[in-house]
Amino acid sequence: MRQPFEEYKGKFSSKTRSTLNRKIRKYTEHCGGSISWKLYKSAGEMPEFFQLARTVSQVTYQEKLLDAGLPDSEEFRREMDQLAQQGHVRGFILFYQDIPVSYLYCPVVNDVLIYAFLGYNPSYMNFSVGTVLQWLALEHLFAERCFRFFDFTEGQSEHKKLFATHHIQCANVFFLRSNLRNRLLLHSQRIVDNFSKLTGDKLDQLGLKSKVKKMMRFGI
């Protein structure tokens, strides 16, 4: 992340850059001509970030379906405060007027930003507020010139594929005893994985995958 932001933008095709610019322009117009967002990084700023981010997190599919929202615990708040005192955290909030609509929380480990918690209010989904905030945050972080990488962590998503520049293979490895029970479990897991992949591929071919995802996440 110590290269200029303009150089990073060069990794996108002209079509993708046009799409991103269109999304930002659409949200700018929705906001009346200018986008309101805020960076949080000091210990004095993080309580405000936490309050606003929790307002968003509690309505996200990450929290409702995956139990992966911004933790609402004293332990997390203490950890966040400690990181802020050391300068090892960045938080971002995107607003519509004075309403928080998306958030991004990134602790810093060895000069690497970790894509830890994020979410957006589904009521603003049509304005791509998650993508807009990610773009604005990256632009700012490149300008800071303080970090080596932005780690999108493990897992696959279109969002990560869009913004990442590199990837590495990673896996969770389990050692199991060779017995009938474990073999049946592994076989069942393969069946489920294959069915999921085949279903996803078929929905993708039919142009229905994104619609089904929205139905599962947001009930629409």
Where are these regions (language model features)?
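Active-site/acyl-donor-binding loops of N-acyltransferases
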Residues: 1-6, 148-207, 212
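A conserved beta-strand-loop-helix scaffold within acyl/acetyltransferase catalytic domains
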Residues: 2-126, 218-219
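Low-complexity, flexible helical/coil segments
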Residues: 7-8, 30-33, 71-77, 91, ...
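A general structural signal for short secondary-structure boundary/capping elements
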Residues: 19, 42, 84-87, 140, ...
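Glycine-rich loops and low-complexity Gly/Arg-rich segments
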Residues: 19-25, 61-65, 118, 129-131, ...
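Acyl-donor binding region in acyl/amide transferases
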Residues: 110-169, 174-175
